[in-house]
Amino acid sequence: MSNYAPFIKPYVEYNEHGWGPCEVPELDVPYQPFCKSDRLGKICDWTAMVPEKKFPSKYASTFGNNSQYAYFYEDDDSTFHLVDTTGSKATKPYQRGRYRTNMRNNVRTRGRTGRGTPNIASLGGSTAGGATASSTKYGKGRHTRNTQNVGRRFGRNAPTRIRESSVMVQSNWVSIEEIDFPRLLKLALPNIKEGKDIATCGSLEFYDKLYDRVNLRNEKPLQKMARVVHTVTTTDDPVIRRLSKTMGNVFATDEILSTIMCCTRSNYSWDVVVEKLGTKVFLDKRYNDQFDLLTVNETSVEPPMEEEGSINSAHSLAMEATLINHNFSQQVLRIGDQEQRFMFEEPNPFEEPGVDLASIGYRYRQWDLGNDVVLIARCKHNAVIQGPNGDMQFLSIKALNEWDSKVTNSVEWRQKLDTQRGAVLASELRNNACKLARWTVEAVLAGSDQLKLGYVSRMNPRDHLRHVILGTQQFKPQEFATQINLNMDNSWGVLRCLIDLVMKQPDGKYLIMKDPNKPMIRLYDVPENAFDSDRDEEEESSEPLSNSNDN
């Protein structure tokens, strides 16, 4: 026999109606609801923990206080009541990760809110440094300008401004192509040679070098020049009509080419009419169009608003900038019957009897863009100057205008122009990047030797009729293009891309339009009579660019 104790098989209960023992009486164990996300801070209720001052409910259950731990007084004292007259302060429940979203903004706030306490005022309560609950970022004494914009740092997530299209898209127009700016920025057409002159027209006056000495202590009032500038489109130019019969297959003006070549810098909507006749393409502008107006602060963070009747609206500023540019380009010349003029081979094609025309010289130039694409464009100069070696140098004269530095939040010219001209120019490059790029492209296309920029400001920010010249500055167009990061190879590539798209289409009329609210170029197929009404209105009320009586 073995010395081991005998093994007795235990009795196992079998529950036919459920799981678990069936003969053991119920012990009335209370059920306590629980949540797996609750923080375990105690193992039993024998002792009470010292609560934290900031988060007294840190270890509380998600389901609140359970009745099994509550103390009930057996005696009934229904006739005795205690009235609490002190106001109760609501405490927010503790939640893990509640302030994790603001950790990025509070990384470097040690010492700003007082004794290194993280800034949580934006979520309620007061900061340790004594700041009020409206403080959001820097604690002490800092209040937000608008309580509805809390969390929109640096203007992010701000509502975008809806711009109007330059032309209303009709239902019978057919969309052919949509090209976004990132695709256009990747284009390049290198090794485009200098344009070849095939015709020169008009006459130029000499630039007055006395305006190079103008500064803040010797400013000059801007005069109103009663001279006329004809802004003739491509198909109405008699010289282009004559040249199109024997040479070239793409025809345009320098304003139209610069608009297309600098389209990736534009924010406002614009459009160019394209007419395809066989193998020839004409790039035109619409009649009764705002195409010739200069934009103001187009690329700034806060461009001008469209306010009816305001002198600082976008349209009023565009009219003001256009007239300033016209007056400045004619005032800085040596005007007079006895003054010398530079004459081109042919007279001004837009000359009219009894009309004092502005000093403009037209150069019709030709470029070979490859793939049997020959471009002919009308370019222009504003003045001529005699170089150090006695040769004639052609100038493109433009004017930048200041209207209200406080509204635009830019550099004040009357304080910085003489001492920090680079800062002034950098501010203009930021606010008017598209306009300066267009001027540079026009000067490069025309073959100008110098690009003369004038700084013109209002005598009073509230007076848009009187201006003063504060200074001038000159650049070489090719060097200035490099300074403003203008890639001419990319500009030629954008132009060639749009020309190739039109060349693939059948004969007809098309429209190239910049989308008003998206960085995108759209190509539409439009009917032949799409803009005939605009042309009739233009012929009824057509006036060349000059100064009106109220300007």
UniProtKB/Swiss-Prot annotation:
Pfam families listed in its UniProt record: eIF-3_zeta
InterPro entries recorded: eIF3d
BP GO terms, sorted: cap-dependent translational initiation; formation of cytoplasmic translation initiation complex; regulation of translational initiation
One GO cellular component, as annotated: eukaryotic 48S preinitiation complex
Top-level taxonomic group: Eukaryota
Biased composition range(s): Low complexity: 115-136
Residue span of region RNA gate: 290-304
Principal subcellular localisation of the protein: cytoplasm
Compartments, record wording: Cytoplasm
UniProt-recorded Gene Ontology molecular function terms: mRNA cap binding; translation initiation factor activity
Keywords of this entry: Cytoplasm, Initiation factor, Protein biosynthesis, RNA-binding
Positions of region (Disordered): 108-152, 527-551
Purpose of the protein: mRNA cap-binding component of the eukaryotic translation initiation factor 3 (eIF-3) complex, which is involved in protein synthesis of a specialized repertoire of mRNAs and, together with other initiation factors, stimulates binding of mRNA and methionyl-tRNAi to the 40S ribosome. The eIF-3 complex specifically targets and initiates translation of a subset of mRNAs involved in cell proliferation. In the eIF-3 complex, eif3d specifically recognizes and binds the 7-methylguanosine cap of a subset of mRNAs.
Protein family according to the UniProt entry: Belongs to the eIF-3 subunit D family.
Swiss-Prot/TrEMBL domain comment: The RNA gate region regulates mRNA cap recognition to prevent promiscuous mRNA-binding before assembly of eif3d into the full eukaryotic translation initiation factor 3 (eIF-3) complex.
HAMAP family: eIF3d
Record text on subunit structure and interactions: Component of the eukaryotic translation initiation factor 3 (eIF-3) complex. The eIF-3 complex interacts with pix.
Protein name in the entry: Eukaryotic translation initiation factor 3 subunit D-2
The organism of origin for this protein: Drosophila simulans (Fruit fly)
